[in-house]
Amino acid sequence: MKRYLVIMTLLVGLILPVSALAGVPLETVKGHVDKVLDVLRDPSLKPESAKKAKKDRLRAISEKMFDFTELSKRTLAHNWTKLSPEQQKEFVGLFTSLLENTYTNKIMAYTDEKIVFTKEILLTEKTVEVQSTVLRKSGEIPIFYRVTLKDDSWRVYDVVIEGVSLVNNYRSQFKDILSNKPPESLIETLRKKVGKA
């Protein structure tokens, strides 16, 4: 009997963390995406004169939605340790700016497509993939958000659009630079791309 209780306790201990996570990552990501959609649909932010205000609102949401440090670490992978602490900090800032510059205009081109969140898949104890689909007249676009649990909050560290991972895409680009050049060369490249050279 005692052995049975021990086994049941262990099973409950293994099951509870997964059960406790159910629903929360999806709801968290959906909440952020809904806020983005609210900004994009706001009539007061439609005029060209409100473009900066719209971008500022979107940036504020992305800062809560994404873990840009984790995203940066995963993008550089083993090359992350080649950067000094100061270089790591600057890289995160520059990479964040690059992503904002690259994707904000694409997001602002939104034309009232419907976004449906379908399910979440547990990847590890602290990482989950939240799956969604953008419904357009021309077809469906699958978008998966990979999130990690940090400080009791689910934050996005990668986005997979139609099977293409944002992290893997940039990792291959940065790997080519770091394969034969020092970290400072990568940082200088990013400075030029975001206009901070």
At which residue positions do the language-model features occur?
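Bacterial N-terminal signal peptides that target proteins for export
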Residues: M1-M8
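Surface-exposed, charged secondary-structure patches
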Residues: N101-I141, K193-A197
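Surface-exposed, polar/charged faces of alpha-helical domains
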Residues: V24-E27, D38, D42-L45, S49, ...
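Early exported N-terminus immediately downstream of N-terminal targeting peptides
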Residues: V24-Y103
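A mature extracytoplasmic/lumenal domain signature
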Residues: F95, K119-I121, V134-R136, V147-L149, ...
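Short beta-strand edge/turn micro-motifs at domain boundaries
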Residues: E140-P142, R146-N168
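N-terminal signal peptide c-region/cleavage motif recognized by signal peptidases
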Residues: I15-V18
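Low-complexity, intrinsically disordered terminal/linker segments enriched in charged
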Residues: D158-A197
